[in-house]
């Protein structure tokens, strides 16, 4: 029924609560959140990374050059379509400033944890 979700290992279709999608470099990161069971403290989630599809398109009508663009891959596009049908996901438009601040906070936490990891490795040397 949901062949694309099944192909990435998602089989608990009825327990999917929501999902998020973000881009980091040349990768799209999909995180699927499941409804938490009564005895769980935190809800379970799965994280998937998909490479972005690269294309060359012609620039403007007058120029003869091409430019590289990246877009969401076809596999991820089909997975999102199935997720939308499961969650009836209605994504509200966020203001650009709010979204940039959220991305910045996420980046800060990723960099901070990576720095701590490198410092621990240096201490062990």
Curated annotation (Swiss-Prot):
It comes from the Bacteria. Disulfide bonds: none annotated. Belongs to the UPF0325 family. This is UPF0325 protein Ping_0715. It comes from Psychromonas ingrahamii (strain DSM 17664 / CCUG 51855 / 37).
């Amino acid at each position: 029924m949901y062949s694309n979700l099944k192909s990435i290992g998602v089989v608990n279709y009825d327990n999917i609560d929501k999902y998020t999608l973000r881009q980091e470099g040349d990768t799209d990161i999909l995180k699927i959140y499941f409804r938490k069971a009564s005895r769980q403290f935190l809800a379970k989630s799965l994280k998937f990374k998909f490479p972005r599809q690269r294309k060359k398109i012609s620039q403007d009508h007058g120029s003869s050059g091409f430019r590289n663009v990246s877009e969401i891959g076809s596999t991820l596009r089909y997975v999102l379509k199935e997720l939308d049908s499961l969650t009836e996901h209605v994504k509200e438009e966020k203001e650009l400033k709010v979204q940039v601040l959220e991305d910045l906070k996420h980046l800060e936490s990723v960099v901070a944890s990576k720095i701590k990891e490198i410092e621990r490795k240096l201490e062990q040397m």
